[in-house]
Amino acid sequence: MHSDSPMTGGGPSRLFILRPVATTLFMIAILLAGIIGYRMLPVSALPQVDYPTIQVVTLYPGASPDIMTSVVTAPLERQFGKISGLKQMTSQSSGGASVITLVFQLSLPLDVAEQDVQAAINAATNLLPNDLPYPPIYSKVNPADPPILTLAVTSDALPMIQVQDMVETRIAQRISQVGGVGLVTLAGGQRPAVRVKFNAQAIAAHGLNSETIRTTIMNANVSSAKGSFDGPTRSVTLTTNDQMKSIDEYRNLIVAYKNGAPIRLRDVATIERGAENTKLGAWANEKPAIVINVQRQPGANVIDTTDNIRAMLPELINSLPKSVNMDILTDRTVTIRASVQDVQFELLLAIALVVMVIYVFLRNATATLIPSIAVPLSLVGTFAVMYFCGFSVNNLTLMALTIAAGFVVDDAIVVIENISRYIERGEKPMAAALKGAGEIGFTIISLTFSLIAVLIPLLFMGDIVGRLFREFAITLAVAILISAVVSLTLTPMMCARMLKAEAEIKHNRFEQASEHFFERIIAIYGGWLKRVLNHPWITLGVAFSTLAFTALLYLTIPKGFFPLQDNGLIQGTLEAPQSISFNAMSDKQREVTALLLQDPDVENVTTFIGVDGSNSTLNSGRLQITLKPLNQRDIRVDEIIPRLQARVANVPDVKLYLQPTQDLTIDTQVARTQYQFTLQGTVSNDLNIWVPKLQEALKQRPELVDVGTDWQNRGLVAYINVNRDMASRLGISMTAIDNALYNAFGQRLISTIYTQANQYRVILEQDTQNEAGMNAFNNVHLIGTDNKVVPLSTIATVEQQLGYLSINHLQQFPAVTFSFNVAQEASLEAAVNAVKETERSIGMPKNINTQFQGATLAFQDALGNTLWLILAAVISMYIVLGILYESFIHPVTILSTLPTAGVGALLALMVGGYELDIIAIIGIILLIGIVKKNAIMMIDFALAAEREKGMSPYDAIFQACLLRFRPILMTTMAALLGALPLMLSTGIGAELRRPLGICMVGGLIMSQILTLFTTPVIYLLFDRLANYFKNKRQNRLQSQNQRELDHSPVNHQEPL
């Protein structure tokens, strides 16, 4: 059969070229699967990479940090420490609260961890105090993860205790039931209660003490089972008036009889409705509020969870009185949606730019249509695989697709360009398609699998970073694979039926001008290529110098972990002197809020003070600042934070720590700043000595700002020294003394009022409004022998001391967490090195262990693995190329293009003022896969010319460079323009995308300029080396054969 017959050639594409209906239906199936997958994909900011985290909170009002540590935290820690798969355990014990955070291995399902935690709590129950008012409560939530939704409930007409009651019963419970919600907390703490404030002098005058009041109320307000009885025909349930539900009932309660006359509770105490905890407060801007913070479960979908909550808000608002208002203060999904929409726009822009490049190079609208169909088809088809893999539409997967827009068109371009070349020579479209597709099939396979090989190491990255980029790598690999399938099936089929013979094509002026332009460029390139090939040593010097320059740039470029995002939210911690009172702290918080609201870029400010599960000490307050939308601001969050801190700098005795909220939360405890490290010692006294020394030294380092610690050992403590002998002689036990103190100063929960909707506590405390400071102890009385009233002051002395406000543990040992931010002109690498150098310079003893935490620890792990990751990518690609080419040499020639990309990427980052972070490293790894395409296309054609046409290596590589110049330039421009929207992005989340785009564009420009010359030179160098060793081996074999012949017995036979 004639070679031009359409029935010959075609390789793997042959079947699809000859069966257009089957090919079309196959592509429609891919398209439909992708569309269905896209509609079902969830939306999120980043892939779900959370550690399984559980927080256990135990409240014991009135207990000191020492008591909380020894009788609550320690028993629980011992049980939790036995759980298999526990990665890290931290705890914070403060006045009245114990918070333990358990972080599990990524491989452990959260539900399994939950069961183990519940079992551990049950095992520790017998060791916990009997009068613990609340059992330990666990939540499947990361405390460092900022709320996904913050609501403020306010009222000008109703008291906050009434508003809190409505919020608890009508709103918080309903929100908690939404799937994906991990924890709903109410900041402001105005839960209704009955407060009994006894007059110490009055009860002493009647020969009573506080314990009498407590036991009387406990015995008078009960609610227990009473049974039932059956009559002849009916059953009767028993009930009594055993519960006291009204204030008047408590006021009229008889405490004792003296001289036959009743002493009622109102005679010795003030009874009123109030808040269960008077030392909690929250404000929305400057208005008192109940603030609802909604946190998600680790791994939950933020968008779905928030949408479900928003859908029920109208119903919840309607359930409240008209005098009560509920407003949304923050919604993290607003910026997540905006960020995803920006990336989607950039994806469409990348596709448009790529199509434009194709048209400029191909000069044919019909030819341009073919790869233009391949791009969306490959990308849309990827959504189906993403859905089956459980991925989401997020910044990283959309970035992968945006980059893929430049990749996936490469295969189609190479196929079309090769087929068009045969059509230009006079071949019919069908014959050209079969011949061109058959010739280029192996190249497409080489390009595809070598590029996917680069992504393989990303799949084996460990821990959080590996989880983070797994979706990115698989999404990109799938898009590339689908692209190869489309390029070997649909593209040649469409070429065979849509492209016209050269004689039938009429080019317009633009197309003719572009053709002349490229012919001129190719002619210029050919002239320069001859010079380079004739003087190879200069080019080789440039090639090897780029390798050295890449290493130098890598060592000198600042290194970071993850780009700082501007999501329009700022988390803050306000720290005051450790001995500050609640009222004084409240004044400070309101003063700071008023100053912050004066900033033109601040939308609203939410603040909270007091001790509960989310805040550990009274001298620290939490802030959440919502900024105006990015398009309404002139500056970004990293410039706003110093300005806000400067605004409050003149407020005396307070320090404001601020950090922007990030989508990627690796930390597992609420911190003052972005980065943390922990000092851990077996002896607390060692930490007392070295923590202040290290903190003071770190404050002097220019690389660090906002250096702080959670070491709070300067709180005021009233130490009561009891004369045990005298107390024993008077018949007073230590239990009685502790109870008297707890009754007076502990806001003691002594009873509970049960209703069908809620439960309300009865709180006992001493009325100290007319007593200042330490004088309040003078009115504490006890009952001794013969029911005599004994003042506490007769058996004890009170001494003011300094003590701990909170006690922190890491893995059950005392620990202190240092917090810091990185100075604007410094990098995270420089900051970490500064911490290490400072520790060495002050002579930190070896028995104090330093551990970096959260993002800082992840940065160190990532930094240590960077070179291994790049090396693994290179080795993976070498193995794949070696298998494809059945050669040890040709893969080295192809990989010689890599240093040029590294130089371009690193130079672009340094010029742009960017750090080498995780995103940039991913960009460099992708460049490794892209730039080798140029070499593959050259070497494939050179080897074919040597093998099939008998050309010399010089002529073969020269002709290959000229023939493949246009597709090389076209594919590079397509990849470059695909990355350009990322480099130029300015919207929300642009901080994530820009480093990737800069790496890609910088690396592609540099590699395009250099590899067009270095690759053919290195090809010829290795060819000469191969021939040299081949000749040397042949000469050695010939010499060996000659020696064997010389020593053969035939040559030594005697003549006859």
From Swiss-Prot:
InterPro entries: AcrB_DN_DC_subdom, Acrflvin-R, Multidrug-R_MdtB. The lineage of its organism: Bacteria, Pseudomonadati, Pseudomonadota, Gammaproteobacteria, Enterobacterales. Belongs to the resistance-nodulation-cell division (RND) (TC 2.A.6) family. MdtB subfamily. HAMAP family: MdtB. Keywords: Cell inner membrane, Cell membrane, Membrane, Transmembrane, Transmembrane helix, Transport. Part of a tripartite efflux system composed of MdtA, MdtB and MdtC. MdtB forms a heteromultimer with MdtC. It comes from the Bacteria. The chain crosses the membrane at residues 16-36, 342-362, 373-393, 396-416, 440-460, 472-492, 537-557, 869-889, 890-910, 911-931, 968-988, 1002-1022. This is Multidrug resistance protein MdtB. GO terms for molecular function: xenobiotic transmembrane transporter activity. One of its GO terms (cellular component) is plasma membrane. It is a multi-pass membrane protein. The keyword Electron transport does not apply. The keyword Kinase does not apply. It is found in: Cell inner membrane. Residues 1043-1056 have a biased composition (Basic and acidic residues). It holds the Pfam family ACR_tran. Residues 1037-1056 are annotated as: Disordered.
